[in-house]
Amino acid sequence: MAVPNTFAGATTAIPLSQLDSNFNTPITIGNTAVQLGNTITTLNVMTLNAPTVTNYVESVVPIGTVTSSYTLNLSTGTVLTATLTASTACAFTMPAAVAGKSFVLLLKQAPVTGGGSATFTGVKWPSAGTPTITTTAGRMDILTFVSDGTNWYGSYTQGYTP
């Protein structure tokens, strides 16, 4: 059976649960060809107005152990995990400020030694001030950052046991 590949006149949603797993006929949304069914499709440079997203999971990017400096990179995800080197201060360099961009950094202490510290260049913190990173071995602080296009604004919660 031929499957139509134009939905320009559609007035209601098409429930994905009713699509056959072999429904891989490309359709065009804007300038992007999309295939439905058991495929993964990446939509680039597309504006969606008032979408509803369900069952959304962000990619977690394991940075690993950081030493005296590290430049944060958001190209592969916006939930980052890093472990501080024992008794070492790490200076984190922020990515370029893009309006509406945000990310979370799960910052852990080394499991046995702890004692690492961190600073973040160019971040505006709330009235409580710049965080003093939890130094207890094995503990974790969660730092959240959001940008207005000019600045990065940071907030934090501390002392978690992962």
Task: Please give the residue ranges for each predicted region.
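Beta-strand-rich interaction surfaces with strong enrichment in secreted/lumenal proteins
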Residues: 92-93, 130-134
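Detector for repetitive beta-architecture
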Residues: 33, 40, 45-50, 79
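Extracellular "spike/adhesin" assembly and maturation modules
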Residues: 1-36, 41-42, 161
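Short, ordered beta-strand-loop transition motifs
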Residues: 8-9, 135-137
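Glycine-rich, flexible loop/turn motifs
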Residues: 3, 10, 68-70, 129
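Exposed extracellular interaction/assembly regions and N-terminal maturation sites
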Residues: 48-120, 124, 139-141, 146-162
